[in-house]
């Protein structure tokens, strides 16, 4: 795959079954590794082996400096295994910029009869800085009335051991209005020096 403004992780398998309401929880808290984004121009590929195992990787650079001496590239690799009721994905990324940073991330899921649990953990190691970590855990209930219910908890960012940790909590309910339209009301609380609380309704369409 080659594309402009295309995420490297677009070819990743991942192992997060959680339907996130807020952006940070969208990759089970591993948005810099398993959910690696783009620097501009991206080349990536993946290969799925028999038995549920897959490998993927890619590189992304700014359009004006592809692999140039002035370093502003991103590189990532992912290995994943998925089965009928569980999965796990491990990813590494190296992101260059003002501060070069490497990330390791792991996310996984397990489906019970009544719910699916998803979890993720990520480490962040900036050059010359302290190692930071973050985590996520969420539950998805696929049959609650006519829709699905999701509830999750995550650190609001990756934190060093000396940092004050803040957490984000969310809950949402997604239900189809018809074959092409889904409504998702949700609520979230994001801790900080001043806590933020919000309620929103998202509408998605498929054609």
Each language-model region and where it sits:
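Outer membrane beta-barrel
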Residues: 1-62, 71-73, 80-87, 138-143, ...
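Structural signature of outer-membrane beta-barrel domains
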Residues: 3-9, 62-64, 95-97, 124-126, ...
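Outer-membrane beta-barrel proteins
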Residues: 31-33, 67, 78, 127, ...
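Detector for outer-membrane/organellar transmembrane beta-barrel domains
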Residues: 72-168
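Conserved active-site loop/cleft motifs that coordinate metal ions or position small ligands
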Residues: 150-152, 181-187
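Sequence/fold signature of self-assembling virion shell proteins
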Residues: 166-169, 184-186
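CBM-like carbohydrate-recognition segments
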Residues: 170, 174-176
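Outer-membrane beta-barrel "beta-signal"
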Residues: 175, 195-207
């Amino acid at each position: 795959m080659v594309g402009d403004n295309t995420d490297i992780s677009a070819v990743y398998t991942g192992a997060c079954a959680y339907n996130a309401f807020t952006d940070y929880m969208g990759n089970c808290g591993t948005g810099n590794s398993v959910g690696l984004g783009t620097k501009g121009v991206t080349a990536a590929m993946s290969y799925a082996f028999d038995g549920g195992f897959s490998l993927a990787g890619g590189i992304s650079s700014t359009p004006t400096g592809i692999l140039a001496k002035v370093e502003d590239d991103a590189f990532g690799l992912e290995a994943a295994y998925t089965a009928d009721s569980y999965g796990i994905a491990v990813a590494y990324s190296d992101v260059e910029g003002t501060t070069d940073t490497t990330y390791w991330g792991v996310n996984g899921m397990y489906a019970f009869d009544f719910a699916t649990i998803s979890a993720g953990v990520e480490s962040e190691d900036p050059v010359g800085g302290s190692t930071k970590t973050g985590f996520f855990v969420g539950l998805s209930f696929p049959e609650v009335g006519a829709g699905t219910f999701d509830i999750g908890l995550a650190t609001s960012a990756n934190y060093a051991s000396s940092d004050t940790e803040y957490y984000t909590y969310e809950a949402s309910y997604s239900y189809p209005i018809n074959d092409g339209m889904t409504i998702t009301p949700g609520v979230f609380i994001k801790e900080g020096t001043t806590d933020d609380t919000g309620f929103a309704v998202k509408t998605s369409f498929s054609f």
